[in-house]
Amino acid sequence: MARIAGTFSGRGFNIETIAVNVTDDPKISKIILTTWGNQDTIIKIEKQLHRIVDVLQVDDLTGRESVKREMALVRVKMTEEQKPELMQIIDTHKWKVVSSGADYCIMEVTGDKEEIEIALAVLKPFGMDDFSRTGAVALAKKNNNVRG
């Protein structure tokens, strides 16, 4: 992963999000990253990644039918007076409460990038105390021989 990140930073390419997970082969990790650029930039990125010996495959999902999701854990300060309204909002948006106490609520929010941004904006007025957010994970709707 360090060589991949180094390839990006050394060439002036930007990584917007990065997520790493295991595959069915414990010797292989899948790195899903989000970047941006025009078509020439994306082609250059792909060529640079293919030069890294340990890279087995590079798939550009641009223009392909795919599912992309992010996840955020959001902690909100909560008073007894706010609780009914907050629970209604959580229920309406189908967010999941993963922990709560007398003065806080931690929820799990999943969706695309825009849905996460909306959730953070909706929760900010409640006294959003902190949040942690994953990078995007993605899968093409049709298999293109992607490992794991």
What do these predicted ranges mean?
Residues 1-29, 34-148:
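Long, contiguous binding/interaction regions
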